[in-house]
């Protein structure tokens, strides 16, 4: 299984806006792309004056081919969603990982970018 963690640095007061975008514009199509929503968290667990919060969105897909299929299915609606999130947040990163004890498949494409 591939775990995906979106790390979004955002002002605490903008978190409801990001979650509304997620609910209205990303979640309706996530299953068709092979994504399963796994959780949403905020850190720190309090709003600190003048400091951003981190919104963590977690997902999973079945395996590496499913991850690349999900990426290939990115369409204009997905791009527009992330552009809208970027307009609200300070920074955003996506982490893609698998179980450390699982054997890693060999990369078969020479010019592949993960």
List the predicted regions and their residue ranges.
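Intrinsically disordered, low-complexity segments enriched in polar/charged residues with Gly/Pro
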Residues: 14-15, 45-47, 81-83
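An amphipathic, aromatic/His-enriched active-site/gating alpha helix that lines ligand/cofactor pockets
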Residues: 21-38, 50-51, 60-97
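Acidic/histidine-enriched, glycine/proline-rich intrinsically disordered or flexible terminal extensions
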Residues: 97-114
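Short, well-ordered beta-strand segments in beta-rich or mixed alpha/beta enzyme
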Residues: 2-9, 38-75, 109-113
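Residue-level signal for secondary-structure boundary sites
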Residues: 14, 64-67, 102
